[in-house]
A protein has these predicted regions:
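Acidic, surface-exposed loops and disordered segments
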Residues: 1-152
Length: 152
C-alpha cells in the first residue's frame, strides 16, 4: 500500500476480533520493522514488552484508563523509554556498530559519538522525558504504519 494511502486511512483501532489473533512471528516482524524508526542520534531508546497473558493485561487495565481493547486485543505492546539509551555507553555502542557495518569511517564515528554525548550531557529529567516521548512516538508511528501495511 502506498505511504500516502497508509497515512490517509490510518485509524486508531478500538475493537478487535477475537477470532483473528496475531501470530507471534508476524508480531515480531512488525516490531523489527518499527525498530528501524528514526531516533535522536540513533539512540534507539525504546524497549517493548509484549503482553498476551490475560491476567497481566487485566492488571494493566487501570493504567490504560479502562480501555477495553487492553483486554480484547490478542497482544498489548507496552512501549518503554530507556533513559540509559542517551548515555555514553549506548551511544558509543550504536555508532561503533554503524562503523562496523561500514556506514562511515572512524573519524565520522568518533565525531558522532562526541557530538551525541555533548548533546545529551546537559539534559535534565524533563529534557530526557521529552526526548523519550519524541523518539518512542516515532517508533509507535512506524509500528502502526507497518501493521496497517500488513493488513492489521
Amino acid at each position: 500500500m502506498p505511504l500516502n494511502d497508509l497515512l490517509q486511512n490510518r485509524r486508531s483501532t478500538r475493537r478487535f476480533r477475537p477470532d483473528a489473533p496475531i501470530d507471534r512471528a508476524e508480531l515480531n516482524a512488525l516490531i523489527s520493522q518499527a525498530n528501524r524508526a528514526s531516533s535522536s542520534n540513533n539512540a534507539q531508546p525504546w524497549r517493548i514488552m509484549v503482553l498476551t497473558d490475560p491476567a497481566l493485561r487485566q492488571r494493566l487495565l487501570p493504567e490504560a484508563y479502562g480501555q477495553e481493547q487492553i483486554i480484547t486485543a490478542s497482544a498489548v505492546l507496552v512501549l518503554l523509554g530507556d533513559r540509559a539509551a542517551y548515555r555514553e555507553p549506548n551511544l558509543r555502542r550504536i555508532h561503533q556498530q554503524e562503523f562496523a557495518d561500514d556506514c562511515f569511517d572512524a573519524n565520522v564515528r568518533d565525531f558522532l559519538i562526541q557530538a551525541a554525548v555533548q548533546f545529551y550531557q546537559p539534559f535534565d529529567e524533563t529534557d530526557t522525558q521529552r526526548g523519550l516521548a519524541l523518539d518512542c512516538g516515532l517508533w509507535a508511528m512506524a509500528f502502526m504504519l507497518a501493521a496497517e501495511a500488513a493488513g492489521w
